[in-house]
Amino acid sequence: MINAVIAIELEAYLEHDGQIEVVHDQGLPVDGYTLYLRYENERGDALAQWLCDHPDHSWLTQFGILLATSYHIPLHDYTPHTLAA
């Protein structure tokens, strides 16, 4: 039997010289956020992934700022494959 979970992943990003980079370190500037819904097995392997996109990105940026500041979310990768390392 495969145990599966639905994960919600919020990534902060920075635009630099026309390139988009994911922000992993606290204290770096952030230009916006992306929100992913991911269907994973128990090992953390993505079985399916959806990027939540909307023409008006301001709501997602405001949501990301709200989560990051309200819950003091550190900008680190806590996915199962990095926790095992």
Predicted segment positions?
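Intrinsically disordered, low-complexity segments enriched in small/polar and acidic residues
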Residues: 84-85
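A short, exposed loop/beta-hairpin motif centered on an aromatic-Gly-Thr core
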Residues: 42-61
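Short N-terminal "domain-start" leader segments
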Residues: 1-43, 70, 76-81
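Generic structural marker for isolated residues within well-ordered, non-membrane alpha-helices
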Residues: 64
